[in-house]
Regions:
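Active-site metal-binding loops of divalent metal-dependent hydrolases
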Residues: 130-134, 196
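Short acidic donor-binding/metal-coordinating loop in glycosyltransferase active sites
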Residues: 132, 242, 285
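Terminal accessory/targeting
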Residues: 1-129, 139-141, 145-161, 167-174, ...
Length: 327
């Protein structure tokens, strides 16, 4: 993408900037449902993927299909026309959003790591994703502090994505508020990824584990987690990360029918997978993955000179996919 076009997109999308990480706390959500429609306000054409009521006002969760940014806004601010999911895919077929969905679906037969696993082609750097699965341990704050300290002179706020589960949010309000504070202080720019509500794990084979466990209710895992995110002032992104990176063709299809793009990883550090240029790096920040955290801190140390010379950067997952599919 040419620099002039990138600047133009950033300027035109200013209403999204600053609202895609967190917003108001919606603590009286009712009638929350999957609802697709074209939403038009002036020259702005967005895709609504959710509708809900809060304090007797109707809201929409909106997606910019070109930049993959999301925001929540009053439904009354837009002229809307409802769409069925096949029509969504047809209407926005040339957008990075639909192309990313199609790319993710192409890997839906994999039991592990289905979805997008490589973000930024031919770029020097990575897209960092940090998973917050349920845990009784405190947040590994050193990860976020290290990112800010390393990149503050090069990229501020530093972009990263957090895959957050419902059970983690319920038990770690102080840590969640601390993360939101980093965004408010303009230290980090966080993309919030849905990581399911319960994130159940058992001792069964992977084909019957995580979201593939018998009795799993995807409406609860997806929509209740989004509601909890909104209650905590987090704006859900268009991304979904499968717990354990485990899925099958059916669950991938169902997640995409919610309008969400499955995101995997080609560099799970704790498993010894080293990142390449454009990798989507995965570490756990929930206190349960000491090896992955140490490996990431060491990676930052090894890349210090490249960071200072702007030869190794953190990339926003959304912008990386926009570059990949905006062709």
């Amino acid at each position: 993408m040419k620099l002039s076009r990138f600047i133009y997109i950033v300027f035109m999308m200013m209403p999204f900037i600053g609202t895609n990480s967190f917003g108001q706390n919606f603590d009286q959500i009712k009638q929350y449902k999957v609802s697709f429609s074209i939403a038009i306000k002036g020259t702005e054409k967005l895709l609504a993927i959710r509708s809900f009521a809060n304090n007797n006002q109707k809201y929409l969760l909106l997606v910019n299909t070109e930049t993959l940014d999301t925001k929540v806004d009053l439904a009354g601010n837009y002229n809307t026309s409802s769409l069925k999911w096949p029509k969504v895919m047809a209407t926005f077929k040339n957008s990075p959003y639909v192309k990313a969905l199609q790319s993710a679906a192409a890997k839906d037969l994999q039991l592990q790591n289905a979805g997008i696993d490589h973000s930024i082609p031919k770029e020097k750097g990575i897209a960092l994703t940090i998973d917050l699965c349920p845990s009784h341990k405190n947040l590994d704050r050193i990860i976020f502090q290290s990112v800010f300290e390393e990149f503050k002179k090069i990229e501020q706020p530093a972009p990263l994505a957090i895959s957050v589960s419902g059970k983690w949010m319920l038990k770690h309000q102080n840590d969640l508020n601390w993360l939101k504070g980093l965004v408010q202080k303009n230290e980090l720019d966080i993309t919030w990824i849905n990581h399911s509500y319960h994130h159940e794990v058992n001792n069964l084979p992977l084909t019957e584990n995580f979201l593939l466990a018998p009795g799993t209710n995807l409406d609860v895992e997806v929509l209740e987690n989004e509601k909890l995110m909104l209650k905590n002032g987090l704006i859900p992104s268009v991304f979904f990360r499968f717990p354990g990176l485990v899925s099958n063709q059916s669950t991938v299809d169902k997640i995409e029918f919610y309008g969400l793009i499955p995101v995997g990883s080609d560099a799970w550090l704790a498993k010894g997978q080293m990142p390449n240029s454009g990798s989507i790096v995965l570490i756990h920040g929930n206190g349960n993955e000491e090896i992955g955290v140490k490996d990431f801190i060491q990676l930052l140390k090894n890349k210090q000179i490249d960071v200072k010379n702007k030869q190794w950067l953190l990339f926003d997952l959304r912008q990386g996919l926009e570059k990949e599919f905006d062709r």
